[in-house]
Amino acid sequence: MNKILSRLFVLLIFVLTGCEQKGCAAEVEYEFLTPQVLVIKNPKPYMHTSHNVVKQGLWQKENALFRDKNGNILRKADVTTFAYFIFEKPLKDGETVSIAGTAAKYDSAVPSNIFKLNQVGNGVNQKQKYAYMGAWLGNLGALPLKHLAGKEFEIRRSSDGKTVCKGILKMRREDSMYQGNIPFTGEEVLELDYSNFNTPGKYYFYVENIGRSMEFVIDSSALNEAFYIHARGLYHKRCGIAKTQPFTAWESPACHQTVQLGRVPGNADHYRKGKTEKDFGFFDIKDNRIEVKHFDLIKDNPPYQQKIITAPGGWHDAADYDRRPYHLRIVSDLAAVYLMKPENFIDGQLNIPESGNGIPDILDEAAWGVKHLLAVQQDNGGVGTWFETTGHPGQGEGLPDNEKRSYYVSAPSRNGTMEYAAAVSTLALAMKKAGAKSEAEKYLASAVKAWNFAIDPGNRAVSWLRYKNKMISYREEPFLYGENLLKAGVNLFLLTGERKYLEPVLEDQKRIQESFSKDFWRWSPLTWMVLELYPVTEFAQLRNEYRKVILRDAEKMLENQENTYPYRTLWHAHNAGWVHAMAWGNYHPLRRAVTLIAAHKLTGEEKYLTGAYLANDFHNGANPLGRSMTSGLGKIYPAVFLDLVSYADNIGEFVPGITPYGNTFGIDRNAVKMVYNNNADKLPIFRRYVNLEFLSVPSSEYSVWETIAPAAVTTGYLLEKPTLPSTELKNRKPAGEFRKLPGYRALP
């Protein structure tokens, strides 16, 4: 029987990889999930084994795109083949098995990745805490674990191995199935509930005849570390400033110090041909609504006069270097979370260049997000909010400071300027709260100028432009977006006491209500938090509507978190209409948990805070893949992703604090063609984190506003005892070549 299985294994390797030994991806690695279950990475075809194998399986997964000897990225997947072996009997500690060209020694002291837990650690105030056990064995399916339910697990202290707590393994709910046949996790999942254990320290889990977990921490410092890494993801994406020691070991020169005044509109949504918009957007000479490519429009409409403005500030949007209007959400949300929990944020907390100026670092980071916009604000108050060029930078063009393209700031519009007014006035409120009087006055003055421009209908953006050798026209909406009008008006009223800022809002309440009902799903959950923090009598109804929607969404998330999947996550239920919409970071638990921290602030109810803690657990490794979702965070984290700076900086490890988009529900067609072929449908949905870098943008890229900032906002709210960063965090060095990191060939 064993010989037959061995021959089948050789055949499977040829079928799955299409290669002999010399064509396989890299050196052989192995790990034991249990004393009886071995995983070999990149196995050699074999005809014998020293131990009887009762089951064996295979899977292959891309790690990234292949690099040639010069470091050039090829349109070829670097694939790892995973071979799974279940032996007839468990190995003893120190016993060696010879199999698939490998001598694998079982060492009970080596942590098993069958344990899925928060790799950064839990705070001491977290009311519910869970780790999980589970594994997916490729075409073998779930590792059987149901028989362990009811058995004991231990928490052992790392320093001496002493058992400090015991609990009972429990089965989590059955795996959900999409349309009855596609699993979400592919696992049988056990739960380790340690909610009643809160003693600070370093520990690991132990289960007899299974093994031990990696270390985990219970301490407030774990939350400080998570917030630090996430928030510094923004610092590492700053534009216009050199990143240097002592603030980071991931150094790069200052970039994009200047910008030219451009002529094109700054609302990205208008460039797409809408289905219903008839009186705003782009139009041909016959007044038909048309779609326009922004790169082409910028090329075809250079400035009438070259006016160069020094404007460092803002953040690179993602892998490339544009600075977008969406980033104003970051400014607003960082300021809002400070107003929600000012006791959580202090000066010096993030080790950034502004640390030591007496202002909480989170507000300094928010201020960087408007620094460039202050520089381009026109005398009449108008602000262009999109900094863009004529094409995407690419591999081989070097660091951002080497970019040869000119950047242009979009023409001011009423709505873009009002969005700026809403964000910068929120920052002014936060600066005032922090006692930073001069900064608050500076941002207030800019917000007032922006308001005066935006509130004037005569400043509606209307223009003629050239596009592909034809003349086209553009006109923005004849109205102001309700969310920004209300937020800016209320903020300015609170800052000045002048009711004139409320009058346009009161006059437009009906349309604002309609906008809220239709479009709130697109807004940040913190958009109208100001109505809760500083109630204005005239807007009591809107405040109540805001509360209702936040609490409705939060309740649904908590229900899904507890009852839908084996691992507690905030994603839509398996049979919900939006379950497929995972791509572009929508799936991220810390992004979704912003709703939960809003609900907690509105009500003070512990359940919402607990839900946000559990979302942080999932993000940090208590998930089906057993990985942290953010580079440099935890022990197994994304080792490579689409990031042009990390490609060019000659630093082995990619920049920390970046949260790639990750799961996409479907599988990228490039991955199907290059890796999975007919096996694609067999990959469980929560394992569909395809990484082919620029060939799989919806999963391999990221953005500062979709994935990085929300994680900083949520973890900032969760902080229990804010402190200055440890010397270890401040002095962290790159770990080395990214292919050597545990996250590169992590289990699929």
What are these regions (language model features)?
Residues K89-S112:
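Acidic, Ser/Thr/Gly/Pro-rich low-complexity segments and short DxT(G/T)-type signature motifs
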Residues F87-D93, S195-P200:
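Surface-exposed, short loops/turns at beta-strand junctions within beta-sandwich domains
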Residues C24-T81, V120-G121, K127-E208, H236-L328, ...:
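Aromatic (Trp/Tyr) and acidic
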Residues Y106-Q128, S213-S252:
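Low-complexity, Pro/Ser/Thr- and charge-rich linker/hinge segments at domain boundaries
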Residues L12-A25:
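Bacterial Sec-dependent signal peptides at the C-terminal "C-region" and cleavage site
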Residues N2-L11:
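Sec-dependent signal peptide recognition
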Residues E354-G358, I362:
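Acidic, glycine-anchored loop motifs typical of Ca2+
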Residues G101-T102, N209-E215:
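Short acidic/polar inter-strand loop motif in beta-rich domains
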